[in-house]
């Protein structure tokens, strides 16, 4: 099992540091002052500071030469209550200030660019 802990702007330094350091050589939780917490459905811990934690059970591991690809089922998702809209029970992505990593660079996420179905919605006639 494993957990995908999505990180945000506040965790950017820790995200990068943990990505370039080996857990064989460092206690990443201790070094980056992160809090491990028991997950609800899997043995791997979640990171308490993470806005969103996705708990997964491994189905298959595929060897791809230089690395492995894990095929898994998502068995639970935990969201930090600070980012849940109490009126709709929806995760407020823009408030969470999540980050993404691509080709050596980190990016901010969260600006809404449309709502579901906007691409096919017909213009209303007056």
Residues of each region from the PLM?
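Basic, polyanion-binding surface patches
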Residues: 1-126
């Amino acid at each position: 099992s494993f957990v995908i802990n999505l990180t945000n702007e506040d965790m950017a330094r820790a995200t990068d540091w943990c990505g370039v350091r080996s857990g064989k050589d460092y206690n990443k939780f201790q070094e980056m002052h992160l809090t491990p917490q028991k997950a609800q459905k899997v043995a791997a811990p979640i990171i308490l500071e993470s806005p969103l934690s996705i708990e997964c059970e491994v189905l298959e591991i595929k060897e791809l030469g230089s690395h492995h690809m894990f095929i898994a089922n998502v068995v639970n998702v935990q969201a930090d209550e600070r980012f849940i809209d109490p009126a709709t029970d929806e995760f407020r992505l823009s408030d969470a200030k999540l980050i993404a990593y691509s080709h050596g660079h980190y990016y901010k996420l969260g600006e809404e660019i449309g709502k579901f179905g906007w691409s096919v919605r017909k213009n209303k006639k007056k």
